[in-house]
Amino acid sequence: MALMALDHTRDFFTIGPFDPRDVADPALFLTRWITHFCAPAFVLLSGLSAYLYGRGRGRAELSRFLLARGLWLILIEFTLINFAWGFDPSFYRGLGAGVIWVIGASMLVLAALIWLPRWPIAVIALGMIFGHNLVDGIRAEDLGAAGPLWRVLHDPGRIQITETFRIYTLYALIPWAGVMAAGCLLGPTMLQDPETRRRRLYQLGAAITAGFVLLRATNLYGDPAPWSMQATPLATILSFINTEKYPPSLLFLMMTLGPSLMLLAAFEHTRGWIAGGLATFGRVPFFYYVVHLYLIHALAIAAAFEMVGVLVARAPEIGLGLPGVYLAWLVVLALLYPLCRWFAGVKARRKEWWWSYL
């Protein structure tokens, strides 16, 4: 959650445009790269949460919950979230289908998958994750009337709705729905005794990470951009870990999910004020996500006004260097903590059914 705020703080506060696959500035690239772990972990844990919610409930009840929550998240993406990015109620530039959209859409897919036995779900989930790079060569612009659907499923980009209105898909459904289904399959492991659970998470995470290194080294499959030897060891490492997120390649998912599983095991019993603060954010992820976008955007406007006297959040000529971005990020976290702590307390005291959607 905290790393997600770093990525969005960088997006609003960095001077000039930034290509996330540009390794020319190692510090800026690594700042972006470390935040790659957020979306895969977020989607995986959403699937795990769905499994835990379904314990003691029938499949019909779980399916209804996933359908309702999925539609709710899609609605929030196209309203509150899109407004947070642009502060423009007309949405004249169009709408963006980001991570909240793909979590909601993946919940709709999972609402159907949970009616299947465990093994078919595993086959479908792994097929989505491991097999989707086989269709990288199919481009939406070559499919005619089916192009918009392919934009949603695998080839992110612009969907022109009318002459003046468009939707930008950023997160492709096929691989991300596979990750959510995999998170649901992880559920039984999380219910085992702590020692067994940690051991299996370490084993699974290490196996996935080792698989990433071996498969990436071959340059045979799993990412559209091969790595290559560079002039310096650092540049070579950056080339090796520079994998595709849009859509998330197999190697991108292995690179991020493997370490995430090991960190999940390592942090299970971590104590201290930092761990406590992160846990506070984690107790109210939906509230955190919505509020942090509004807060970062508002702070970016205030910073721009202070620097150049213009009420605009992002422009090529204004912004902060990387040290300033990290300082702004810490300010954002400090402001978010009391808000999330307050809301977590309110949510814990309220028992109405609709609180589960917040």
Predicted regions and their residues:
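Alpha-helical transmembrane segments and their immediate juxtamembrane cytosolic regions
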Residues: M1-L358
